[in-house]
Amino acid sequence: MWLNAETELLYPVRFNGKQRVVYLKGEAYFDVSKNKEMPFIVQMEDDVAVRVYGTEFNVNTYDGVETVLVTGSVSMNQGGKEVLLKPNQKGIFDKSKDGIKVEDVDVLPYVAWKDGDFIFRNESLGSIMDKLSRWYGLDVFYQNGDLRDVHLSGNLKRYKDVQELFRSFEKISDARFKVKGNTVFISKL
C-alpha cells in the first residue's frame, strides 16, 4: 500500500472477524491479496466503500470519491447500490445524483504518483495546481481566474524542484508563476 500526501488511513492492529476493513481519507494505492474468507474493504466518506477481490487499485477522496482499477476486480458500494469495476475503469461517486458512474480510462495518470511521477493528460491547470499544492505544501493564487481552465499535458518527476516544474509550464502555456515563500502567484503572460 502507498499513501499520497495529506492522506489518513485508519486500520486495526489486527484484523479480526470476517472482513479486513480500513478507513481512508485522501489517496492510496492498494495491492491486495485475494482472501475469500476475509474480504478487504476500503471505507470512505458518504458511506462509500470499495470491496476488493484481490487486485491493484487506486482510491482518491480529495475531491469526491473515485476508484481506478489497475488489475483484478473491485466493486464500489454506496447506499446499498453496488457497481463492479473492470481493469482500466474508474468509478466515481456523484453525490448530487446519489450514484456511481463508471468510465474507461488510461490508468497511468491516476497511479503514476506512487512511482514518483506526475502525468497530466489535457488536465486543467486548476486540477494540476491542486495536486502540486498538496504535494509541495503550497498556497495558490490566480491573478486571473480563467487560468484555472487552461489545459496542459506532460510527464514530470514529483521530486523535482517546484521552480523547475513551473518553468516547464511556462514554456507550454501563457501562464507565469511567481513563488514567494510557500505561495504561488499565477498570472497571464
Language model region names:
Residues 1-189:
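A residue-level detector for the "anchor" residue at the start of short, highly conserved motifs
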